[in-house]
From Swiss-Prot:
Subcellular location: Cytoplasm; Cell projection; Cell projection, Axon; Cell projection, Dendrite
Gene designation per UniProt: tub-1
Main subcellular location: cytoplasm
Highest taxon listed in the record's lineage: Eukaryota
Source organism: Caenorhabditis briggsae
PANTHER family, sorted: PROTEIN KING TUBBY, TUBBY-RELATED
Record text on subunit structure and interactions: Interacts with rgb-3.
Lineage, top ranks: Eukaryota, Metazoa, Ecdysozoa, Nematoda, Chromadorea
Role noted for this protein: Has a role in fat regulation independent of daf-16. Implicated in ciliar sensory function which is required for normal sensory behavior such as chemotaxis. Functions in life span control via the insulin/IGF-1 pathway. Thought to be involved in neuronal trafficking.
Region (Disordered) location: 19-47
Protein name: Tubby protein homolog 1
Protein keywords: Cell projection, Chemotaxis, Cytoplasm, Lipid metabolism, Sensory transduction
GO annotation, biological process: chemotaxis; lipid metabolic process; positive regulation of neurogenesis; protein localization to cilium; receptor localization to non-motile cilium
GO terms for cellular component: axon; cilium; cytoplasm; dendrite; non-motile cilium; periciliary membrane compartment
């Protein structure tokens, strides 16, 4: 009798999966015929930002920035395109004209070259490192393609960052400024596979030497029942006792809910309210309960920001919960988010020709991986708050801007490295 019930349940699940797959395929076919434009006019962009403010202050775009490739969305390819099918994309250096890209200029099997020419990066749907590795080895990308870049108004103050590292990593990013960073994963020692060390460097953009400034290091703690990453400004001492210890990332048992804390103490272990740890951000990954594979869906919750002005920078609001119901995760679950900022990942678009989900990373990400993502505000989807993705087996790029801090962005990146049992 139990075998009959099990067989019936399995058949029912398969039938539900088939119905949902058919619905998803039908939606993709209905939306596959249109090719979205790549840029909007300055006036339209300004009007949209006024109608849908994402943050307390205006979004950091200059008038020249509206023709930049920050406003270059994905170009979905129609299913089974004709041989002379063309895609239109707009170059930031020539805002008044369009450049045509001929899909059939490349060999039929060279999908990576086609995607590269329109700055699209495929997203694989497995959290397995071997799957990621197979993905980019089977579809190599070409280094000779001139990559698109996200433009920004001003460069970071590199001297200030070098002289005030501990302060810089904790404060919100300067407005109108983009911080281009790289993450290197270093595997060494007996436990190199389980406990690698991650190093975050800021890329200096005002020099031809491609110099880098060390910002943070992170490592997963041993003998911890759940994911527990320590973040430090001292790469030689990744411990809670080290002077550089500034934050930690903690997850639930499934690896679907993460909280980023500062270096304060658990409220259950201290009587000093000023030493209680702050919650810097929380990250939620949506679970795939029926076993369907697809792009990860992320939600990022963070405390509000007190906007800055000419005399003072923006300041993150302090969020020190003592009770569980006041945590970022619980406030988001109950819908009490008026004083918080809630961000989401930008949904990849399905590409019928490559049979994969793709995102436009503006040339900063070159390898397919389930870890690749872009964080946006729902009301301003073209304002990329953060993007993260793979460029080689152990190298990744991480770009962030206001209102995130370096610690928040690096902590969010750490959540992507951790395996998620219920998300695949």
């Amino acid at each position: 009798m139990s075998d009959t019930n099990s067989a019936w349940i399995e058949q029912n699940l398969q039938r539900q999966r088939k119905m949902l797959e058919d619905k998803q395929k039908q939606k993709r076919h209905q939306s596959a015929g249109s090719v979205r434009t790549t840029t909007t006019t300055s006036s339209m962009s300004m009007n949209n930002m006024k109608d849908y403010p994402a943050f307390e202050t205006s979004l950091p775009f200059s008038m020249s920035d509206h023709t930049s490739n920050m406003n270059t969305p994905l170009i979905p390819t129609p299913q089974a395109p004709p041989r002379n099918h063309t895609l239109t994309t707009r170059q930031s250096s020539m805002p008044a004209t369009d450049t045509l890209i001929q899909i059939n200029d490349y060999p039929e099997n060279d999908i990576s070259a086609k995607l590269s020419k329109v700055n699209l990066t495929p997203c694989v749907v497995s959290d397995d490192e071997d799957s990621d590795r197979r993905s980019y080895r089977e579809s190599p990308w070409h280094n000779d393609i001139v990559a698109d870049k996200i433009k920004t108004d001003i460069l970071p103050d590199y001297n200030y960052i070098k002289n005030n590292l501990q302060k810089f990593v904790d404060e919100p990013a300067q407005e109108h400024c983009l911080y281009r960073c790289s993450i290197t994963r270093h595997k060494s020692g007996v436990d190199k596979t389980m406990y690698p060390t991650y190093y975050l460097h800021l890329e200096e953009m005002d020099t031809d030497k491609k110099a880098k400034i060390f910002l943070l290091a992170a490592r997963k703690r041993k003998k911890s029942t759940t994911a527990n990453y320590l973040l430090s400004t001292d790469p030689t001492n990744l411990s809670r006792e080290g002077d550089g210890y500034c934050a930690k990332v903690r997850s639930n048992a499934l690896g679907t809910h993460f909280t980023i804390y500062d270096n304060g103490h658990n409220p259950k272990k201290t009587d000093n309210q000023f030493s209680i740890r702050q919650e810097l951000a929380a990250v939620i990954y949506e679970t795939n309960v029926l076993g369907f594979k697809g792009p990860r869906k992320m939600t990022v919750i963070m405390p509000g920001i007190e906007p800055g002005n000419d005399s003072k920078p923006a300041v993150r609001c302090i969020h020190r919960p003592v009770l569980e119901k006041h945590t970022l995760l619980e406030k988001n679950r109950s819908g009490d988010t008026n004083s918080l900022k809630v961000l989401t990942n930008k949904s990849p678009q399905w590409n019928d020709e490559t049979q994969s989900y793709v995102l436009n990373f503006h040339g900063r990400v070159t390898q397919a991986s389930v870890k690749n993502f872009q964080i946006i505000h729902p009301n301003s989807p073209e304002y990329i708050v953060m993007q993260f993705g793979r460029v080689s087996e152990d190298e990744f790029t991480m770009d962030f801007r206001y209102p995130l801090s370096a610690v928040q962005a690096f902590g969010i990146a750490m959540t992507s490295f951790h395996g998620k049992l219920a998300c695949e």
